[in-house]
């Protein structure tokens, strides 16, 4: 097997293994936190963690099942029967099965001297779905739970060891999910080269530094006004949902699924930027950044005016504002640096070893298998590359949604 193909296959296996370990680690950490809260008599905190965990799991399995049923039956001929897959999703094990199946696909190709184009393309197809589901899971479950834990810490004035573990792992996990999703989208467009190490590091850092202050601002407001944070969330969520509806998204195979997607995207936009439609993205990204920044400033200012520079728990609000502001502007600077100098937006035509996937060369024959979901998102994210990318209509003709 050529070295480049072997590296591609090995990467799929590693991604599948990391996804499985991350899923299990998050589950163990959540259940550990629930047990600790119950032992401390904090039943409301334990219930909130379980509610967040449950609703995220249900939505994740629902997305996974809708995508499976939308795909042609012959595409997943190596998977389990449809009734058994339905049972796995009902038991909340659909995402875990996807990770295991993706890793199995990669391992099976490791024993082939020269994997076929179809096998390599199918491995990419599975990896793209896993990356999208992991991103959804990060914002449906990890981000709200991280906000809850930070609010608890701010209320109590101290953090237990399991809380510090959850906070650090959640911040890193969410930022990694954003990076992995961004990298996976580039495999859908022939004119987009893959991210290098320096570009990946800067992309990871600016997402971490911009997301952190936003979550901390919401957590601060939640700690000070625990009965009003739900009203704040639903108010902004409705505004963001209306904004998404105006953009006319077309991601899911039917209208009901599309509204589920819009509801989920509105939740993600409450915390971070996510491009949901085609066209030039810079204007929408700037509008969203100003909107979220203004809202975060309003949340912090309200907490400051009502409680002064010290929270009832004894934590210095001035210290939190200083650190959060520094992180935000550093993250904003890194974001500008990334898109000005490190964003690989040029078109290139590399020499490829025979038998490799050939995703980046516009002169190679079209792939036999396309992930239409990821291709649509990639065309939205990389608007300039859409003209050189595989057209959505051509993807549909290939029979893969």
Curated annotation (Swiss-Prot):
The record marks 354-355 as: Cleavage. Changing residue 248 to T: Does not affect ability to promote phosphatidylserine exposure. The modification Phosphothreonine is found at residues 356, 375. Keywords: Apoptosis, Cell membrane, Cytoplasm, Membrane, Phosphoprotein, Transmembrane, Transmembrane helix. Changing residue 375 to D: Mimics phosphorylation status; activation of the phospholipid scramblase activity. It is found in: Cell membrane; Cytoplasm, Perinuclear region. GO terms for cellular component: perinuclear region of cytoplasm; plasma membrane. It is a multi-pass membrane protein. Changing residue 64 to L: Abolished ability to promote phosphatidylserine exposure. Promotes localization to the cytoplasm. The modification Phosphoserine is found at residue 361. Residues 1-8, 69-158, 222-223, 280-284, 335-401 are cytoplasmic. Widely expressed with higher expression in testis. Expressed in the bone marrow and mononuclear leukocytes in the blood; highly expressed in thymocytes and lymphocytes. Expressed in the mature retina. Changing residue 150 to E: Abolished ability to promote phosphatidylserine exposure. Promotes localization to the cytoplasm. The chain crosses the membrane at residues 9-29, 48-68, 159-179, 201-221, 224-244, 259-279, 285-305, 314-334. Residues 30-47, 180-200, 245-258, 306-313 are extracellular. It holds the Pfam family XK-related. The keyword NADP does not apply. Undergoes proteolytic processing by caspase-3 (CASP3), leading to its activation. Changing residue 305 to S: Does not affect ability to promote phosphatidylserine exposure. One of its GO terms (molecular function) is phospholipid scramblase activity. Belongs to the XK family. Interacts with BSG and NPTN; which act as chaperones to localize XKR8 at the cell membrane. This is XK-related protein 8. It comes from Mus musculus (Mouse). The gene is Xkr8.
């Amino acid at each position: 097997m050529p070295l480049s193909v072997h590296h591609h296959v090995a990467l799929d296996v590693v991604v599948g293994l990391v996804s499985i370990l991350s899923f299990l680690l998050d589950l163990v950490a959540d259940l550990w936190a629930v047990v600790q809260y119950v032992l401390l008599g904090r039943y409301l905190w334990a219930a909130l963690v379980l509610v967040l965990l449950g609703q995220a799991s249900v939505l994740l399995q629902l997305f996974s099942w809708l995508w499976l049923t939308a795909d042609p039956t012959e595409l997943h001929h190596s998977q389990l029967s449809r009734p058994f897959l339905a049972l796995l999703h009902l038991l909340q094990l659909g995402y875990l099965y996807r990770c295991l199946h993706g890793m199995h696909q990669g391992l099976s190709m490791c024993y082939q001297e020269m994997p076929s184009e179809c096998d390599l393309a199918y491995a990419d197809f599975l990896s793209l779905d896993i990356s999208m589901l992991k991103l959804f899971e990060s914002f449906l479950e990890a981000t709200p739970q991280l906000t809850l834990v930070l609010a608890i810490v701010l209320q109590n004035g101290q953090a237990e060891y399991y809380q510090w573990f959850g906070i650090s792992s959640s911040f890193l996990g969410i930022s990694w999910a954003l990076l992995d999703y961004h990298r996976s989208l580039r495999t859908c467009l022939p004119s987009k080269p893959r991210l290098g190490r320096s570009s990946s590091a800067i992309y990871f850092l600016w997402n971490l530094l911009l997301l952190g202050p936003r979550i901390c601002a919401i957590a601060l407001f939640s700690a000070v006004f625990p009965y009003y944070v739900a009203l704040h969330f639903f108010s902004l969520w409705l505004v963001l949902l209306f904004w998404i509806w105006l953009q006319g998204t077309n991601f899911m195979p039917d209208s009901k699924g599309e509204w589920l997607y819009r509801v989920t995207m509105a939740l993600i936009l409450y915390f971070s930027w996510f491009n949901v439609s085609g066209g030039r993205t810079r204007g929408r990204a700037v509008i969203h950044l100003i909107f979220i920044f203004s809202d975060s400033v309003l949340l912090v200012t309200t907490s400051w005016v009502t409680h002064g520079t010290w929270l009832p728990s004894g934590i210095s609000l001035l210290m939190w504002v200083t650190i959060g502001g520094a992180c935000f502007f550093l993250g904003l600077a890194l974001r500008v640096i990334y898109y000005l100098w490190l964003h690989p937006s040029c078109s290139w035509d590399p020499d490829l070893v025979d038998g490799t996937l050939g995703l980046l060369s516009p002169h190679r024959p079209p792939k036999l298998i396309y992930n239409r979901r990821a291709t649509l998102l990639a065309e939205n994210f990389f608007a300039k590359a859409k003209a050189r990318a595989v057209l959505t209509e051509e993807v549909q003709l290939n029979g893969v949604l």
